[in-house]
Amino acid sequence: NILSTQFSSDEGEFVVLDYMPCYRSQDETGHYLPAELYRYIHWIKGKPRFKINYHPAPNYAQGQVILNITPQYIESYCSFDNKDRQYLYASLSLQDIKEKKEIILEKDEFLLLSYNEKVIPIDIEREKIEYCRTLVYWLNWTDRSKKYTLYNDVIERSLLVLKLMSYHNGAVLAALTTSLPEAVGEVRNWDYRFCWLRDASMSIETCLLYTSPSP
């Protein structure tokens, strides 16, 4: 699914598109589902200004966060455990992002947050390809769903959320909130990362009723 957020002011206008890549592999035997998040910033008009607050918290924020800037990305990891690393790629100035400086938008830009260091170069053209493939995948999936005269948009959005909660091996998450605490600082933590049979059966039943079986 793709989240679109439009910003407009007297200075200008732009749209932010957030998505995780998802599409069929070239040999049609599986899916391309990397653990990464793209943010495509589509410039519309003017010279809008904004700041990027990049504040990663690896290892559950239990230690100081180290940020290293390379020519290709910003690498982040915990001071006492460097195994959990994140890589931020961007067409914008990495130094400006790290220092939270004001950015003036005059053309399309992108950001990519990944758990893996990329072998191939990442640029705006690569990002557009990932966006188009992901968009086509979700359009094809919704096209196979039943259509209704009333509340079709609401039903379609609900089905898309249920589809997001399904793993490629068939498991279905109980909720997208995953492991949010009941209250900040408290010990009670409702962990929804696992496949609960009751919740999963209800989600699967709904998808079978309203959509065509598809990967």
What are these regions (language model features)?
Residues 1-212:
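Acidic, mature catalytic/reactive cores of soluble proteins
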